[in-house]
A protein has these predicted regions:
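Short, conserved beta-strand element in jelly-roll/cupin
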Residues: 43-44, 54-70, 180, 191-207, ...
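A cytosolic small-molecule/anion-sensing beta-strand core signal
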Residues: 64-65, 82, 101, 201-202, ...
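Short acidic-glycine-tyrosine-enriched beta hairpin
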Residues: 75-92, 212-229
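A short, N-terminal "cap"/entry segment at the start of jelly-roll beta-barrel domains
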Residues: 1-38, 118-174, 257-275
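A short hydrophobic beta-strand segment most commonly corresponding to one strand
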Residues: 60, 88, 102-118, 197, ...
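Conserved short histidine dyad/triad with adjacent acidic residue
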Residues: 24, 38-55, 175-192
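Short beta-strand segments in beta-sandwich/barrel cores
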Residues: 49-51, 66-72, 86-87, 186-188, ...
Length: 275
């Protein structure tokens, strides 16, 4: 398992300024990590206005704070963006992303970004391996609607509440969940058949590698990443809110077994070099 922090990313030159310096993009995972996807933590200033078109990727954006609007430039349809909204765009979706209040979101790409890309004149990124071949169009999901429909789950053997917002059926190459641990929760987990990235949004806690005994502090802006070799324990000192990305994606109905694992769903990415 491995941990990423904003301080480490800054020291490594992995925090990029985009969209006329209105966006700070921290590249937490890249293609080199071998997890089947990449993700960024993005903070965007009020007034940012970008036309984007990811011809070679799927991108999912989960709004954590702030407000804005996304518009499908093919149909003209617009959707308001606010905390708890997840919108997904792909090769067919030339779109406009406009921010009306300082905004914070997590962005997941598949295929993964190398991490050094800049938007081209169409608002896209260069291909990095085979891209999706699809006729699907952009779509949105809302955490409050999923919760109101009774589709939330209790997971981690009773220690967490999760909304599985993207699953294998969405066919974007990864799964995405919104997860809450209550203060005092403790879970032993072991994803034998998956890679999982966890990005802390709020709260504090600790994650421990149960093979080596090494522990790391969990706090906002920390990402911890676990794979098939990483039996680990998560402890919540306060209420923790995080987002979780799985590859291969979950079917969506899985529950943790006695080892803290989830059933296999597809081939497992190799992970970082030397893993």
């Amino acid at each position: 398992m491995f941990i990423r922090t904003l301080d480490e990313l800054a020291a490594a030159g992995r925090i990029k300024s985009l969209v006329n310096d209105t966006t700070r993009s921290a590249r937490f995972l890249t293609a080199a990590d071998g997890m089947g996807f990449s993700y960024n933590d993005n903070r965007v200033s009020k007034g940012s206005d970008a036309v984007l078109w990811y011809k070679h990727h799927w991108e999912a954006n989960y709004i954590i704070a702030g407000r804005g609007e996304v518009t499908d430039l093919t149909t003209g349809q617009s959707w308001p963006l606010e905390p708890g909204v997840l919108y997904v765009v792909g090769p067919n979706d030339r779109h406009r992303f406009r921010v009306t209040e300082d905004e914070h979101h997590v962005s997941v790409f598949c295929p993964p970004l190398r991490g050094d890309e800049r938007h081209d004149e169409d608002g896209g990124y260069a291909a990095n391996g085979p891209g999706p071949q699809t006729d699907r169009r952009m779509f949105l999901k809302r955490a409050d609607e999923i919760r109101a429909a009774g589709k939330g789950m209790v997971a981690a053997n009773g220690q967490a509440r999760t909304l599985r917002m993207l699953t294998k059926a969405d066919d974007v190459g990864f799964g995405f969940s919104d997860v809450h641990f209550a203060a005092g929760a403790e879970a032993t987990l072991w994803y034998k058949h998956h890679w999982e990235a966890n990005h802390i949004i709020s709260g504090t806690g600790e994650v421990t590698d149960l093979t080596t005994g090494q522990s790391w502090t969990l706090e906002p802006g920390v990402g911890y990443n676990v794979g098939p070799k990483d039996r680990h324990r998560v402890r919540a000192h306060t209420d923790i809110h995080l987002v979780s990305v799985f590859c291969p994606p979950l079917e969506g109905h899985e529950l943790h077994d006695a080892d803290g694992a989830l059933a296999p769903s597809d081939p497992v990415p190799p992970g970082p070099e030397g893993y």
